[in-house]
Each structure stands twice: as C-alpha cells, then as structure tokens.
Amino acid sequence: MHEKDLLLLAESFKRYYFEHFERIPVPDRAAQREFGYQRFGGGMVRHMRVKGSDELRLLLMQNSPSDVYCSNGIYSFPELPMSDKDWKEADLIFDIDAKDLGLPCRKDHTFRRCSSCGRSHSGDGCPRCGPGAHDQISVLCKDCIGGAKKEVEKLMHILEEDLGVGRDSVVVYFSGNEGFHVHIGGTQFQGLGSRERGELADYVRFVGAVPQAFGMGRNGAARRDFDYDDEGGWKGRLHREFFGPKSRSSVAITAAIKEGHRAFGERLKQISPVLGANIDPHVTTDIHRIFRLPGSLNGKSGLAKIPCINLDKFDPGSDACLIDSDEVQVTADMPMRLKLGGRRFGPYNGEAVSVPRFAAAYMVCKGLASAA
C-alpha cells in the first residue's frame, strides 16, 4: 500500500476514534486482559495492559491503529509474555465467516488483483501482465451475510435448546468484514480449557456423530431403536431431517434399517454441515486469542465491529459504515458495483472519482482504490 493510502486511512480512522470514542465500550475486567493493535503498514503490537477508558483513548489517539484487539482470556499479568501471564479463564466466543460457507454467490463478488500492476480482474490471469501472483478480494454481499446470519441463528438455537444458554446472555457482533462474532456471557463456560472447548465446537458443528448414538448398531437395528422423534437435542433434529414427520417416517426408517450401519454413517457425515453450525473451531478453542475490540474499525474494510441488536434487519453496509461522509478523491479500479452507506458505487476502471470518505476507506482497504 502506498504512503498516501496509509495516510488517508490513518486520518480517517483517527477521526472516527476521536469523534466516536463513546462507541467503544471498555471491556469488563479490562486491566486483566491483553490488548494489542496493528499499525497501518506496520507490525503487530501485543502484550499490553489497558486499565480503563483514558488509557484506551490514549492508545487510539497516539497510534491511529488499523486494528485494535483485546483478549478473551483473563490474566494476572496481561502485559507479560504469554508463558508468564498466569491465565485464569476466558470468555467463550464463536466465529462465523461468510467465506467459509461455500455459497454459490461467492464467485460473483470475488475477483483478483494483480500483484505486479495492481489491476483488478476476474479471470485466471491479468490482462496486462498475464498469469502470476495475485490477491483475492471480495466485497460485501447480501446473500453471504444472509447465509452467515442463518448460521448464527442455528448456533444460538443449539446453545439455547441443548445447553440452556439464554438469548439474553448472548451478544452477536458483526466482525467488521464478512462475518459475526458470537460472545457468550456468564460464567458457565469461562473456566473451560482448550480441549473442552474443542468438544463443544464439535458438538455445535455436529462433528463426530456415530450411527450407534442414533439407534443404528453395527449388526443392524429394529424400528423401536428409532423411536426418538420427540426428543430434544441432536436426536430430535436428526430424526426430523432423516425421517420427516412421525406420521410419514415409517417408510424412511425401514429403508434406513435395510441400508445398514455404513450407509447410515455416510448420511451422518453428509448432513453434518446442514444441521450443525458452521463455526471456526480454531477460534473457539483458542483461550489466548485476541479479538477485535467491539466498536473498533476493521482494517480490511473500514467498517466497525458493532453489536447486532436486530440480527434479521442488520445491514452491515449501512449500520456498520460509520466513517465520515466528506468527499475524497481516489483513483478506483473496481470491476463490480458496491452498495455502501445507502449509496451505490462502481464499477470503476482505473478512473479518478470523488466519493464519500467511508467509501474511499472501504475501497482502499480492499485494494480497489488509491488516494489521489
């Protein structure tokens, strides 16, 4: 990224933090959490202690970071190296990202940028430079966000029905790019280690299910072994998915018994991504991870990580677009349309345009424009 692009982003982000610091709540037990930040065009700074609002404001004003992070972990000494922090517990957080869903619309809003000349293209090779190194870029998509919302709802239903997690103890945040962070409140899960969190991640993803747990023995099964249609949890969900309503399940159960153990196991594997919540298990199991600070801007987009009060109506292109709207001159190379802040932009073919600062920041973050 060119120096003028870094300056544009640093100015835009700093202005946001100066004018809207009230949007960034200081986490509970902040002094026991590790903070960190990413510099524009620079490296990561970690192992910081922030005691309160004044120190957080100072960090943002002095450094104008591209990204700000805070640990889910609680430590005795958060400012020390990891081996000396003395971990106590950690918040339980799930990550759902639209790019991991494999939706068919993905190809329609993803393209490539040549690493040599910086031009955007949708083919296998750059029209100017030919085949070579490239970056893959995607922009906001209503269908992708909708798909991620469905996974959030699926996760929340599993947590509520199977584990007794009330909706009032769950906060869903838009990540600032293309996904959601689901924060689970309370103390029920905070003491879990990585192994236990891994088991929980497998559970909500419906990974590792075996036929015997659902009535299908290695040596066959009887009809009574599938009499769990009224049960809660995975048994009830699986029964409804495999066999349908009780009034019409007889034929499906007979067919499953005839097909046997191996076929039933294959069906379990196939149905796993349909019934389970598509979360990133590595995020859930990492008890030392630092997460994007709520209210802060995402350096990959210029959009904010904000809570979704009404998930169904939430529109990231509008609700999370919080940078100022004064006009900025950029040279844009964006081969598709983009809706942001209630306005439409593009397509652009290497042309000079005047756009609101929030759009300029988004396009520069994505590598779709350069400051004029």
UniProtKB/Swiss-Prot annotation:
Cofactor(s) the protein needs: Mg(2+); Mn(2+)
Domain of life: Archaea
A GO BP entry: DNA replication, synthesis of primer
Pfam families listed in its UniProt record: DNA_primase_S
Key words of the record: DNA replication, DNA-directed RNA polymerase, Magnesium, Manganese, Metal-binding, Nucleotidyltransferase, Primosome, Transcription, Transferase
One example GO MF annotation: metal ion binding
Active site: D95, D97, D280
Keyword Transcription: yes
UniProt cross-references to InterPro entries, sorted A to Z: DNA_primase_S, DNA_primase_ssu_euk/arc, DNA_primase_ssu_PriS
GO CC term, one of those recorded: DNA-directed RNA polymerase complex
Protein task: Catalytic subunit of DNA primase, an RNA polymerase that catalyzes the synthesis of short RNA molecules used as primers for DNA polymerase during DNA replication. The small subunit contains the primase catalytic core and has DNA synthesis activity on its own. Binding to the large subunit stabilizes and modulates the activity, increasing the rate of DNA synthesis while decreasing the length of the DNA fragments, and conferring RNA synthesis capability. The DNA polymerase activity may enable DNA primase to also catalyze primer extension after primer synthesis. May also play a role in DNA repair.
Family: Belongs to the eukaryotic-type primase small subunit family.
Full protein name: DNA primase small subunit PriS
